[in-house]
């Protein structure tokens, strides 16, 4: 039986309790920055964590959540965390490449996970714990993985087959793997901050994007995209991280209580993610502004065959051993088309 990452952290912390120093300044303030709206799965989970942190510490900790890039933009937030200007983040996994750690881009490989249960074999098991542990050499404490969901493509023209992608400028997160993925479709990747995606689509600077449905809806991308094709081609998730020096200097009891709050928030985040995405898709349909297309089995197979070329091309960049470990954990066969 696998021990989850959160349980492992709790067991470690149980051995280090010490009373709160008499001169400790309370409440301890934690700035938690993220780039999406409060009504997304991540936004709701961050607020839930703040609530549980206050309750479990009996007011000794106050988590101030800054959503929608109000404190730091995509490209700045990880550096701000390392400098201690902010104490916690939940960046998408691709952004951790900014730390010089490419292994997290394994989650960007297309069609790697058949479903969320298969994904959780990685994020909730030994491999997920190992990946988060690699952040510590960069002054970052990895605490948990939060789901958003599986992505679909959008554009202002129907995307029913491989030729329909040709020449499109598609917004991605900064990620070598995502760049390679988009090029397998004959499209052009355009790495842009999430906060600027709507405007870039509205002005025609880019032609399309890839997002889970909750992002399409909460960012009102349906207003500037006429078509969404339900591909479920890739996963978008987040790492909940903290400044390591800040985390290590917390009293042991506070660390234990915050780890418990993170565990509860993780269960909450992952529970609501699929619900939120399903509801968002129905809300997009209800606007009547965007047509939703479901690929046929043959169309999906064509797209999958093209995109799977990303695996062999990018495995050396990610780290072949990490890619192989994920294959083994999930039962994925890269040779099965």
What residue spans do the PLM features occupy?
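Short, low-complexity interaction segments enriched in Ser/Thr/Pro/Gly
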Residues: 4, 20-22
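Bacterial N-terminal signal peptides
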Residues: 7-18
């Amino acid at each position: 039986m696998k021990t989850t990452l959160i349980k492992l952290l709790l067991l470690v912390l149980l051995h280090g309790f010490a009373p709160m120093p008499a001169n400790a300044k309370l409440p301890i303030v934690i700035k938690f920055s993220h780039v999406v709206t409060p009504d997304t799965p991540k936004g709701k989970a961050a607020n839930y964590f703040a609530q549980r942190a206050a309750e479990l510490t009996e007011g000794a900790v106050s988590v101030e959540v800054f959503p929608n890039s109000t404190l730091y933009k995509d490209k700045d937030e990880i550096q701000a965390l390392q400098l201690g200007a902010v104490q916690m983040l939940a960046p998408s996994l691709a952004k951790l490449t900014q730390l010089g750690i490419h292994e997290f881009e394994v989650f960007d490989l297309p069609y790697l996970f058949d479903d969320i249960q298969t994904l959780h074999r990685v994020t909730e098991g030994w491999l997920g714990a190992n990946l988060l542990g690699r952040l510590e050499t960069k002054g970052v404490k990895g605490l948990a993985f939060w789901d958003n969901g599986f992505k679909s493509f959008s554009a202002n023209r129907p995307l029913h087959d491989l030729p329909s992608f040709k020449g499109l400028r598609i917004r991605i997160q900064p990620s070598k793997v995502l760049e390679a993925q988009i090029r397998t479709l004959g499209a052009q990747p355009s790495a842009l901050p999430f906060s600027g995606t709507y405007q870039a689509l509205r002005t025609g600077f880019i032609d399309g994007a890839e997002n889970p449905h909750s992002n399409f809806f909460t960012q009102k991308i349906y207003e500037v995209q006429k078509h969404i094709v339900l591909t479920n081609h890739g996963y978008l998730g987040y790492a909940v991280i903290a400044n390591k020096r800040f985390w290590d200097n917390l009293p042991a009891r506070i660390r234990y209580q915050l780890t418990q709050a993170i565990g509860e928030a993780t269960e909450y985040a992952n529970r609501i993610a699929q619900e939120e995405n399903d509801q968002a898709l129905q809300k997009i349909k209800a606007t009547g502004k965007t047509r939703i297309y479901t690929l046929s089995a043959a169309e999906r197979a064509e797209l999958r065959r093209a995109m799977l070329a990303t695996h062999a091309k990018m495995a050396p960049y990610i780290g072949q051993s990490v890619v192989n470990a994920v294959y083994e954990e999930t039962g994925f066969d890269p040779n099965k088309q």
